[in-house]
């Protein structure tokens, strides 16, 4: 029975990822005054399936000088971790109801760094290695602010369980009292998922395509799936944290529909940002975090800790 539950979580995620690639190409196409994919199926709707068949039927090439085992393990690990991170998300009922769901997700996203590092190192290519080192430095850096912002939000929530955020936000979305945190959180999620304007890992002019430059066919598709699954997951987490959805136990489908609409709107903004903004320089990327975001998030975190004590109250015990 538990296996069926896992499959009913994983298959829709993979399907959503497949169509997200199509939506991205369509939106970027229309923003650049062209059509986007429109040949395969009606209005190009079957394009993701054509891409999947093409990728998985090609021969997975492997550089002669690469470290075979690690080269193969890295993409599998990337996708496994990306899918595992979905398990504590309440939609409205999580796959595994954890007391420390938020910490679990942070730990999993930290482990995802290893798949990037291994893929870059095992490829035995200077471009892949530099791309991997950039990606790792960026991901680790932005995780710091993500963790501090999460802590600040959880101080208002009074619990590490994600499900209780729906109860906390019945009266008011946390977006309103903590909008600076929400803005920094959104920008940090862009950087965490290596999306434009923070896609420094795949600077075509200098690194060809980043840490996955030596990958082809199936393993490349696994990295691709992991990246897009992370994008949807991060946006869903943003919707749960800051745009709390009202949960009526008698009608849980309403919660799911509401959450999905918010997640889709956030994902659209990811694509809109990609079409609008040029790539940051690497030093600007690091300055933004260490000189701007970190002091601000620390100050706001201290504020969220001290305010309840100052007003002689405690966080809500939900």
Curated annotation (Swiss-Prot):
PROSITE patterns from the xrefs?
A: COMPLEX1_ND1_1, COMPLEX1_ND1_2
Q: Which UniProt keywords apply?
A: Electron transport, Membrane, Mitochondrion, Mitochondrion inner membrane, NAD, Respiratory chain, Translocase, Transmembrane, Transmembrane helix, Transport, Ubiquinone
Cellular component terms (Gene Ontology): mitochondrial inner membrane
Q: Membrane-spanning residues where? A: 2-22, 70-90, 100-120, 136-156, 172-192, 222-242, 253-273, 294-314
What the entry lists under InterPro entries is as follows: NADH_UbQ_OxRdtase_su1/FPO, NADH_UbQ_OxRdtase_su1_CS
Q: Name one GO molecular function term.
A: NADH dehydrogenase (ubiquinone) activity
Reaction catalysed by this enzyme: a ubiquinone + NADH + 5 H(+)(in) = a ubiquinol + NAD(+) + 4 H(+)(out)
Localization (cell): Mitochondrion inner membrane
Which protein family is it in? Belongs to the complex I subunit 1 family.
Q: What does this protein do?
A: Core subunit of the mitochondrial membrane respiratory chain NADH dehydrogenase (Complex I) which catalyzes electron transfer from NADH through the respiratory chain, using ubiquinone as an electron acceptor. Essential for the catalytic activity and assembly of complex I.
Quaternary organization: Core subunit of respiratory chain NADH dehydrogenase (Complex I) which is composed of 45 different subunits.
Name the UniProt record assigns to this protein? NADH-ubiquinone oxidoreductase chain 1
């Amino acid at each position: 029975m538990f296996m069926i539950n896992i499959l009913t979580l994983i298959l829709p995620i993979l399907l959503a990822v497949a169509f997200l690639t199509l939506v991205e190409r369509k939106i970027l196409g229309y923003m650049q005054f062209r059509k986007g994919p429109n040949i395969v199926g009606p209005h190009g709707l079957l394009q993701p399936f054509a891409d999947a068949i093409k990728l998985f039927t090609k021969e997975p090439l492997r550089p002669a000088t690469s470290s075979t085992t690690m080269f193969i393990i890295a993409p599998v690990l990337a996708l496994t971790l990306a899918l595992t991170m979905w398990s504590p998300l309440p939609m409205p009922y999580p796959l595994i109801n954890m007391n420390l769901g938020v910490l679990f997700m942070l730990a999993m996203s930290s482990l995802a760094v290893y798949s990037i590092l291994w893929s870059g190192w095992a490829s035995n290519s200077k471009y892949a290695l530099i791309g991997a080192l950039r990606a790792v430095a960026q991901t680790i850096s932005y995780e710091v602010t993500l963790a501090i912002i999460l802590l600040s939000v959880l101080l208002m929530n009074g619990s590490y369980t994600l499900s209780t955020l729906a109860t906390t936000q019945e009266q008011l979305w946390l977006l309103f009292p903590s909008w600076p945190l929400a803005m920094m959180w959104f920008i940090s999620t862009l950087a965490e998922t290596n999306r434009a304007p923070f896609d420094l890992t795949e600077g075509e002019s200098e690194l060809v395509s980043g840490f996955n430059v030596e990958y082809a066919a199936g393993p490349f598709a696994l990295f691709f799936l992991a990246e897009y699954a992370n994008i949807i997951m991060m946006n869903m987490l943003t919707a749960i944290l800051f745009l709390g959805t009202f949960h009526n136990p008698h009608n849980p489908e309403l919660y799911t529909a509401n959450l999905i609409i918010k997640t889709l709107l956030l994902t659209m903004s990811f694509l809109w940002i990609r079409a609008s903004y040029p790539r940051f320089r690497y030093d600007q990327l690091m300055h933004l975090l260490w000189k701007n975001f970190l002091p601000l998030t620390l100050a706001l975190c201290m504020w969220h800790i001290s305010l309840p004590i100052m007003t002689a109250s405690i966080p809500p015990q939900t």
